[in-house]
């Protein structure tokens, strides 16, 4: 379990990280274990990709930083208890 991801979700703080060699800025929505046992992160993406609320394999995230920027609400398509995850560490 990644404590930075849990804290970022609980405190509604934005993240910066690199994924597939692209820098990203995101609002974390849900973090847990997928049905195949992979740690997954659902985000609302602000910069760095074309999908607004993609799902990321946490093991492929590099240079993870919690920013001193807060957000107020989930992304427009967010649904609690993400069906892609069998166990959830933290969610909005």
Residue ranges and their predicted role:
Residues 1-92:
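Core beta-strand-centered patch of the WYL/Sm-like small regulatory domain
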């Amino acid at each position: 379990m990644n404590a930075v991801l849990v804290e970022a979700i609980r405190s509604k703080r934005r993240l910066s990280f690199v994924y597939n060699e692209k820098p990203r800025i995101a609002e974390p929505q849900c973090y847990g274990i997928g049905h195949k046992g992979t740690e997954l992160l659902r985000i609302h993406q602000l910069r760095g990709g074309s999908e607004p609320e993609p799902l990321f394999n946490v093991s492929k995230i590099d240079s993870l930083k919690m920013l001193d920027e807060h957000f107020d609400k989930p992304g427009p398509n967010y649904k609690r208890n993400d069906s892609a995850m069998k166990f959830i560490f933290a969610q909005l």
